[in-house]
Amino acid sequence: MRQEGVPSFFLVMFINFELFLLVMEKEVKYPTAEQIIEYNVLALTLIKVKKADRPQVLSHARIELIIKNCKQLEGDLYDKAICLLKGIIQLHPFASGNRRTAFIVAKEFLKENGGKFNIEDDPTQANVMQGIRENYYTDDEIKEWIQHGKIKAFKRFEK
């Protein structure tokens, strides 16, 4: 004996589930290699540090690897932003300005995807970027820094 209302219940549940998937599958916008290279040029133009700074790509393959790793990473937008940030800093795809470029790329990635980047554009943040390069911070600490702008001071490991 068929119960009235059951098929319509499942139909409503199916439709709601499909709508849920559409909302959840909001396309994440990843930077292209060309955009990351443009951000490097921008970083070196806007933030002068050394006279010898020059926009030069050392490895296109490293840039592509950084993007690929970010796309494959399970996690939220902040985890992916950290992947971009650390990837550019640690894989060093440019002759100059890797940390400055990483900062801009992570910030723009989050803004483009509706995330928040609560780190001040301040030269004092350079020490934190050095700490990221040297694996001083955990990903959770970096996530907290991006979301709330606070992180412990970087101190070099003593030998």
Describe every region a protein language model picked out.
Residues 2-159:
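FIC/Doc superfamily catalytic core
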